[in-house]
UniProtKB/Swiss-Prot annotation:
The gene coding this protein: psbZ
Entry GO CC: chloroplast thylakoid membrane; photosystem II reaction center
Similarity remark: Belongs to the PsbZ family.
Subcellular location: Plastid, Chloroplast thylakoid membrane
Lineage per the UniProt record: Eukaryota, Viridiplantae, Streptophyta, Embryophyta, Tracheophyta
Protein name: Photosystem II reaction center protein Z
HAMAP family linked: PSII_PsbZ
GO biological process, one term: photosystem II stabilization
Source species: Pinus thunbergii (Japanese black pine)
């Protein structure tokens, strides 16, 4: 169970890093918000799901 928790935390960190880099780049592109809206919303949804998943796994570890 610990390895699953560590993997989930690593995935959360990786997704966070990608969003920190990717969202400003997507918004600064010439097409801006209109072309990258779906990608940003998908990334944020994945991040929220990862936070909830890590929280659930944390309740089993502690």
């Amino acid at each position: 169970m610990t390895i699953a928790f560590q993997s989930a935390v690593f995935a959360l960190i990786a997704i966070s890093f990608l969003l920190v880099i990717g969202v400003p780049v997507a918004l600064a592109s010439p097409d801006g918000w209109s072309s990258s809206k779906n990608v940003v919303f998908s990334g944020v949804s994945l991040w929220i799901g990862s936070v909830l998943f890590v929280g659930i796994l944390n309740s089993f570890i502690s």
